[in-house]
């Protein structure tokens, strides 16, 4: 478990693993070279994560993320060229991962170019899949990621802008195929 993601305290880098006995030696060797230990203040603060007040606050955050995710998934389902079959179901984290498909690509018009154009035209940042995919398979240029951590209003505005932008982008792609 990683406290930083589970309790919305990014940067703390505090967590633990439950592993089979057969992996303890190998994981310990890796861990010793990656981290020395979590700072004492982080360890002490982490204890607060399990009290009732923190649990209630965490539930409010989780509900906010659920509502933002629902807004994004709903709005994406209404955009021509983005069907639900092209959306990886969000399972952990606070991101939606979308595959535009080979049919919506042209040389020089993948998701890196799309995300750049979207940022320039609509002032909204999505992340191209090339940041997450193995470059040997060329899947990153047809995928992109949307964060829903910004809240419902932010999600609604971003999706309104994307709904306006994406059809124009597809026309540009088609004219360059």
Question: Predicted segments — roles?
Answer:
Residues 3-4, 83-85, 130-135:
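Short, solvent-exposed loop/turn elements at beta->coil junctions and helix N-caps
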Residues 47, 63-73, 85-101:
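Conserved glycine-rich beta-strand-loop-beta hairpin in the small C-terminal domain of fold type I
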Residues 20-21, 51, 99-101, 149-151:
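Residue-level recognition of strand-loop junctions within catalytic nucleotide-signaling folds
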Residues 104-114, 153-157:
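Short, conserved charged micro-motifs
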Residues 1-2, 88-89, 95-99, 128, ...:
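Short beta-strand segments
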Residues 1-66, 73-77, 164-166, 171-174:
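Conserved core segment of the aminotransferase class I/II
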Residues 117-126, 132-177:
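PLP-dependent enzyme catalytic core of the Aspartate aminotransferase-like
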């Amino acid at each position: 478990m990683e406290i930083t993601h589970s309790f919305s305290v990014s940067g703390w880098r505090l967590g633990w693993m439950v592993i089979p006995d057969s992996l303890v030696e190998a994981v310990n060797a890796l861990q010793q070279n990656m981290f020395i230990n979590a700072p004492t203040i982080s360890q002490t603060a982490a204890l607060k994560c399990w009290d009732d007040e923190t649990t209630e606050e965490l539930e409010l955050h989780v509900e906010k993320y659920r509502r933002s995710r629902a807004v994004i998934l709903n709005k994406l389902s209404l955009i021509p060229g983005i069907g639900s079959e092209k959306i990886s179901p969000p399972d952990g984290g606070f991101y939606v991962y979308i595959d535009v498909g080979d049919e919506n690509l042209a040389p020089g018009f993948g998701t890196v170019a799309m995300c750049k154009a979207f940022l320039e035209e609509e002032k909204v940042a999505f992340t191209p899949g090339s940041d997450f995919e193995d470059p040997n398979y060329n899947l990153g240029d047809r995928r992109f990621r949307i964060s829903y951590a910004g809240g419902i209003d932010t999600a609604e505005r971003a999706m309104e802008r994307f709904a306006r932008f994406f059809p124009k982008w597809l026309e540009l792609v088609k004219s360059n195929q």
